[in-house]
Amino acid sequence: MTLDGFENDTTARIVAVDWASLAEGEAKRLRALGVDEGAEVSVVHRGVFGTRDPLALRIGRMTIALRRVHARAIACHLL
């Protein structure tokens, strides 16, 4: 399942990232923020209108905002 399918207060482990579907700059930023295979992420909040964009994710001690289109490139297993 990809990260965009998880609801609030869900914790998952990243098992794969489709780096090819992301622009080079986007991929670099996500890696710098700790988004990579093996990382544990929690969905803290989702937008409330229409596309429910963006997602607020907790990775370690950081909370980041991620667009749904980018979250679709991140495959996770529920913890």
Segments predicted by a language model, with ranges:
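Cytosolic, membrane-proximal regulatory domains of ion/volume homeostasis and mechanosensation machinery
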Residues: 1-3, 77
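C-terminal structural segments of small proteins and small subunits
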Residues: 10-11, 48-79
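Exposed beta-strand/loop interface patches that mediate assembly or binding
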Residues: 13-17, 21
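Short alpha-helix capping/helix-loop boundary micro-motifs
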Residues: 23-29, 50
